[in-house]
Curated annotation (Swiss-Prot):
Taxonomic lineage: Eukaryota, Metazoa, Chordata, Craniata, Vertebrata
Disordered: region residues: 26-45, 72-98
Domain of life: Eukaryota
Record organism: Homo sapiens (Human)
Name of the protein: Uncharacterized protein FAM215A
Gene giving rise to this polypeptide: FAM215A
């Protein structure tokens, strides 16, 4: 399976594991009146702001803020394997998989199931 970007969209129900933006990322929750039609935002807790997600081959999901939050060069986040570091050194820039695996805020999608 290939990595891909989905901007302004939300994952289908029951999609593997998920990292979703939460209040720690400064996102605010907004509930719609009960009379309005359910939206993809409602499925993820009523977030009023579209969020960019990175879909990863292992069936994991990251928010764009964590995906791109990396410290200065030389300060590797925990969880990187030597194999991923080797691939990074050969290419001269971090791979998509290496950056995604550096995200420490994974939340099981079952938390969001109704």
């Amino acid at each position: 399976m290939v990595s891909l970007w989905v901007e302004g969209t939300f994952p289908p129900p029951g999609f593997g594991l998920a990292h979703v933006a939460c209040s720690g990322h400064g996102m605010k929750q907004k509930r719609k009146p009960a009379s309005s039609e359910p939206t993809p935002e409602d499925a993820l807790g009523g977030s009023a702001v579209p969020v960019r997600f990175h879909l990863h081959p292992e069936g994991l999901l990251w928010c764009s803020r964590c995906f791109f939050s990396h410290g200065p060069k030389g300060s590797e986040p925990p969880g990187r394997s030597a194999g991923l570091q080797g691939a990074t050194e050969r290419s001269g820039r971090p791979s998509v998989q290496a950056q995604a695996q550096a995200c420490e805020n994974l939340v099981p999608a079952t938390v969001w199931d109704g």
